[in-house]
Amino acid sequence: MKVRSSVKKRCEHCQVIKRHGRVLIICKANPKHNQKQG
């Protein structure tokens, strides 16, 4: 899980999810794409 100031979808499998006021990118196809805004 990378922590970034700006998160972007990196492939078509990436999903944008909001949890506890934070924006997360979750990707089941390529877990390297997982990101959270911090």
Curated annotation (Swiss-Prot):
Pfam families: Ribosomal_L36
GO cellular component entries: cytoplasm; ribonucleoprotein complex; ribosome
Stored InterPro entries: Ribosomal_bL36, Ribosomal_bL36_sp
Keyword terms: Ribonucleoprotein, Ribosomal protein
A GO BP entry: translation
Record bears the keyword Ribosomal protein: yes
This protein's name: Large ribosomal subunit protein bL36
PANTHER family given in the database record: 50S RIBOSOMAL PROTEIN L36, CHLOROPLASTIC, LARGE RIBOSOMAL SUBUNIT PROTEIN BL36C
Gene from which this protein is expressed: rpmJ
Organism for this UniProt entry: Pseudothermotoga lettingae (strain ATCC BAA-301 / DSM 14385 / NBRC 107922 / TMO) (Thermotoga lettingae)
GO molecular function: structural constituent of ribosome
Family: Belongs to the bacterial ribosomal protein bL36 family.
